[in-house]
Amino acid sequence: MSLRIILKRDFSQCIRVLESGSKSPTIANRFQAQYGNKNNNMKRNTANNGTGNGNRFHNKYNNESRRPYPKTKYQQQQQQQQQQRKPQQHQQYIIDPRKIKFDNGTESARNAIEEIFNRVNQLQRNYQIQLITDSGLKKCHLSEILQKLDLSINGLQLIDKSTTTTTTTTTTTTTTTNTSDEDLPLIKIITVRDMINQYSTYLNNLKQLELIKLGSSKTLKTLDIKLKLEQKKSTTKEILMKWSINNNDFKLQKTNEIKKLINNNGGNGKSFLINMVYNKRNTNKPINTIFKRRSNTEEDEQELIEIELKRRQLLIENLQSLLTELNCKWTIEGDINTKMTFNVTPKGQPTTIEPSTTTNIVDEEIEDYNNNNNNDDGDCDEKKMNRTERKKRKSEQQKQKQKQKQQSKTNTNSNTAKEEDLDALYSFKIED
């Protein structure tokens, strides 16, 4: 009986609670009111945020107001790589340079460019290169250059970085140069002739290497000859001249030798040396030691030394006058007593034989004829008078030239007489 009474009481209380909830709709379950509807909850939180009150968890972990943690070095590197890849994704479609076909140009030019493609592919498979321009180095793809290239006019040159010393160049563009750009091959735009010549030399070198591997003796000899010729071209040439040279030998032999050397150089300013020496063996032999055995007394020795010094001084003056005629500059090193060297550099064009007076007269008459034909407004009588006056002037100029030549001959004869007198004195003293 007691259990029934207890159950009845509990059941009656539950019914009262349910009836009270259905009767009063304003009074709601607080758990359901707070967590039942999410949309209402969000509205409540936003309203409370405006007043300053609200959910403390929402305010604490709000992503909008929260500051991010600092990035690590690895994250920074990844971000930089992504930024570098973004512009490459939006670039135009890059063509393989091996698929480009040239309508212009000869077969040799096409073969030369194909060889450059293969060499660039060995260095960089992506065909990324550095182009040499007036403003500096420019990084680009090889196909960009080939699309604008006209093979009938221009060509390409691949420059070896091992032989050339590259210097840092400042470009006007805003792009920054990375360390990886140093590994890219250098290419320069040149003329087609230069490209074909370089390609032919490249093929010749390959053939020579193949023959050397096979063991041919002819190729080795030809290479030795080429090396010797290159060494001769690179080295400065020398002319030996003894102090004891005669006047005739100087005029005939040494003058022709100096003129030939200047003509072979083409008058391009390539310097050469003239060494004035006692002998090939004893180049620096002083004058004091030459006449010790020949002279008996000191007075005779001093006289011979004075005569030798005068001879040497005359020889130096003759050489200087010859160099001035050939339009050359020179610097002197050394001393008359031992050895002297003339470092000579030709200034102008190579020396040539002077043309005859008859050819000059003919050229001048042709110029007069052309000038007279251009001036058609004048009368014939005035033209004839002008011609006669010009002929008179030419005859006077020729007479003056002949007088100058005669004076130069007399001066040379006097110099030769002096030199012959010195030679005679020198020989007389030696015989005594």
From Swiss-Prot:
One Pfam family in the UniProt entry: mIF3
Family named by the database record: Belongs to the AIM23 family.
Recorded GO CC terms: mitochondrion
Sequence segments annotated as region (Disordered): 36-91, 368-432
Transit peptide limits: 1-18
Protein species of origin: Candida albicans (strain WO-1) (Yeast)
UniProt superkingdom: Eukaryota
Key words, A-Z: Mitochondrion, Transit peptide
Residue ranges, compositional bias (Low complexity): 36-50, 75-91, 407-416
Amino acid composition bias (Basic residues), ranges on this chain: 389-406
Keyword Mitochondrion: yes
Localization: Mitochondrion
Name used for this protein in its record: Altered inheritance of mitochondria protein 23, mitochondrial
Keyword Cytoplasm: no
